[in-house]
């Protein structure tokens, strides 16, 4: 078997046949070819160059012509499955193999035949069509470069050596492109330059619009105004409860409606105050039972609600004028509580109409109406007492959490002293309201 392979592996005859081949020059000289005129093809100088005084030079033709050596008898006995690949598959090789000079072509054949293989392959460039070769000026087919992205057959890569085959496969794997990009290149190849530019420009413009247009949250589009009403939570419940406790605008408010509103119209009665305070205390109890009560801002709103409830109780009992704010001194006799009068609260906002003779479900006389209202309010203060005890626990927990936070830290609205001060203010205000009602009943 060695005797059969040795004649094929010897590079002597192939080297001698290629060295005897003379290099072929181009038919036209360089000056005539650049001017695109017919050349007289005279050597060493054509008539046009002699007439114009130009240097006439004939370049070496890139088309080397057919190999003059006789075909080997082994080529005719090759199996069909091992035939040469088509021109399209040869384009899958790296580009530096295509631009081969005669010297490089001789080295490639010598290197290919120096390794004994069962079936050697030859790559004559004359078998390839001229339009399939990628030229340096970029006039070759663009789709032909990307159409065949599969690696070459194993027989050819073995002839090129292990390192060169691995480099060729890595080069081919890096040429993988997207199918949409390949389709755009094919449309550009067939002359659809306008369509290609229109598609590219349109896609870029659409992408710019998508990036430049501000995204609007669908929830904000469908949510009613204000948006926090749709997000029902303890904060929204506290805000709604606090809003309900301010049914009238203050007397000195600049934004108050000036449409002829009477101070005695739409005023709260004693029954309305008691029912409204029940709803407010139930809402506060629900808030304090939630884990949201650990938030300092929510606790501050709850404290305001409880203080406002106590203010309405004092106004309904008719003792609001005898007691000032928390920690204030009593001033009995400063305001008279007569029937059919409005308890304006002495510069406060809680205004209760005491004219109706109905208190609860009982019909009372006008003279007994203030005393009955005070007794009814005193019986409702136990709700506020249990609420203050529950709120004091939450305030103590909030104070413990605030103890580890530095002063004036935005994580909590109050410091440790602030939470303890809120609890003391609530208890002092509750004692003041209850004591004023009891003193009023003793005087009556």
From Swiss-Prot:
Polar residues compositional bias, start-end: 136-149
Record pathway: Mycotoxin biosynthesis; aflatoxin biosynthesis
Keyword Transport: no
Record field: compositional bias (Basic residues): 106-116
Annotated Low complexity bias: 120-130
Principal place of residence: nucleus
Keywords of the record: DNA-binding, Metal-binding, Nucleus, Transcription, Transcription regulation, Zinc
Pfam families: AflR, Zn_clus
A GO cellular component entry from the record: nucleus
UniProt cross-references to CDD domains, sorted A to Z: GAL4
Swiss-Prot/TrEMBL GO biological process terms: aflatoxin biosynthetic process; positive regulation of metabolic process
Subcellular location per the Swiss-Prot or TrEMBL entry: Nucleus
GO MF term list: DNA binding; DNA-binding transcription factor activity, RNA polymerase II-specific; zinc ion binding
Its job: Involved in the regulation of aflatoxin biosynthesis. May have a role in nitrate assimilation and sclerotial morphogenesis.
The protein's name: Aflatoxin biosynthesis regulatory protein
Annotated source species: Aspergillus parasiticus
């Amino acid at each position: 078997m060695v005797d059969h392979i040795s004649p094929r592996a010897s590079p002597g005859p192939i080297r001698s046949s290629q060295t005897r081949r003379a290099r072929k020059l181009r038919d036209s000289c360089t000056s005539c070819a650049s001017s695109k005129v017919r050349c007289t093809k005279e050597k060493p100088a054509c008539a046009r160059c002699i007439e114009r005084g130009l240097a006439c030079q004939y370049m070496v033709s890139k088309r080397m012509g057919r190999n003059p050596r006789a075909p080997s008898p082994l080529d005719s006995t090759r199996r069909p499955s091992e035939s040469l690949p088509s021109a399209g598959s040869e384009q899958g090789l790296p580009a530096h193999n295509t631009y081969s000079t005669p010297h490089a072509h001789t080295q490639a054949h010598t290197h290919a035949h120096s390794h004994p293989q069962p079936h050697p392959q030859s790559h004559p460039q004359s078998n390839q069509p001229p339009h399939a070769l990628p030229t340096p000026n970029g006039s070759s087919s663009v789709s032909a470069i990307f159409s065949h992205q599969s690696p070459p057959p194993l027989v050819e890569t073995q002839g090129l050596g292990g390192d060169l085959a691995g480099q060729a496969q890595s080069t081919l794997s890096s040429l993988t492109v997207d199918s949409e990009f390949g389709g755009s290149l094919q449309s550009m190849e067939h002359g659809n330059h306008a369509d290609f530019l229109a598609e590219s420009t349109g896609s870029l413009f659409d992408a710019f619009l998508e990036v430049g247009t501000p995204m609007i949250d669908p929830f904000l589009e469908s949510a009613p105004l204000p948006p926090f009403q749709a997000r029902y939570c303890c904060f929204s419940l506290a805000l709604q409860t606090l809003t309900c406790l301010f049914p009238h605008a203050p007397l000195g408010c600049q934004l108050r409606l000036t449409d002829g509103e009477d101070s005695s119209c739409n005023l709260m009665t004693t029954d309305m105050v008691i029912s409204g305070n029940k709803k407010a205390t139930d809402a506060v109890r629900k808030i304090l039972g939630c884990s949201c009560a650990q938030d300092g801002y929510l606790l501050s709103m709850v404290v305001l609600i409880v203080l406002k409830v106590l203010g309405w109780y004092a106004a309904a009992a008719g003792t609001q004028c005898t007691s000032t704010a928390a920690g204030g001194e009593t001033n009995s006799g400063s305001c008279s509580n007569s029937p059919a009068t409005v308890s304006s609260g002495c510069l406060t906002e809680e205004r209760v109409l005491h004219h109706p003779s109905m208190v609860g479900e009982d019909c009372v006389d006008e003279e007994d109406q203030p005393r009955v209202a005070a007794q009814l309010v005193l019986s409702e203060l136990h709700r506020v007492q249990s609420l203050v005890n529950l709120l004091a626990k939450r305030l103590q927990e909030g104070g413990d959490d605030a103890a580890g936070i530095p002063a004036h830290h935005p994580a909590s609205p109050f410091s440790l002293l602030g939470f303890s001060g809120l609890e003391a203010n609530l208890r002092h205000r509750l004692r003041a309201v209850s004591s004023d009602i009891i003193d009023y009943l003793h005087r009556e």
